[in-house]
Amino acid sequence: MSRLTILLVVLVMATFSSPLRSQERKLEPVDEATRDLSWAHFKNRLLDAVMKRDRKFVLGILDRNVRIGVDGVRGVDEFRKQWHLDADDSPLWRDLPSALFLGAAYMKREGRPRELCAPYLLAQWPRSMDPHAYGAIIAKDALVKAAPSSDSPTLATLSYDIVPVADWEVADKAPDFPQKWTRVKLKTGEGYVPEEQIRSPIEQVACFVKTESGWRMTAFAPAGG
């Protein structure tokens, strides 16, 4: 075997055994209920209700034991109270659409019926990746900046990558600019992506079940409750 051949073999083995390479994971977007016309109709109706601040509709589609948090808090009254649903600036009006727009995936957990959960990240998350330490880029060609500013140099471009997160919310360098950034770890150091282009799998997750009377929301909670 020639020296050149040996060198090539060593390089190939190093490439595939590199810890950095083994850490590269992607989470492509999915929407597993696209062929279910009843879901498409329901989701559009729910988004329309949220846009119009239609509290009656939102409360009407809640399961009576709807999950609100990971601490076991449940019920329609608690949902209304914890989400400040009677306020025009309820965070629900912002957070629920951001979850639904990303697509949904089915998941089955012990003691619960099969649920359709949005966004898809929690249901599709690799078990080998710590959901508390990583986030998933939810955009194609997201620019990673050297500093929390759109004017700073671009370090990399990411598309649906799972990346380690150092800080979930960093203010823009411009004091009065509302853009928030997330500090992520790269092979070569750290960089910043707009916070709307990355998401944690344990952020607010909305889960639904299909019943004889239609779709019901069973949870809107961190990690789906």
Describe the function of each predicted region:
Residues V205-G225:
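Long, low-complexity intrinsically disordered regions
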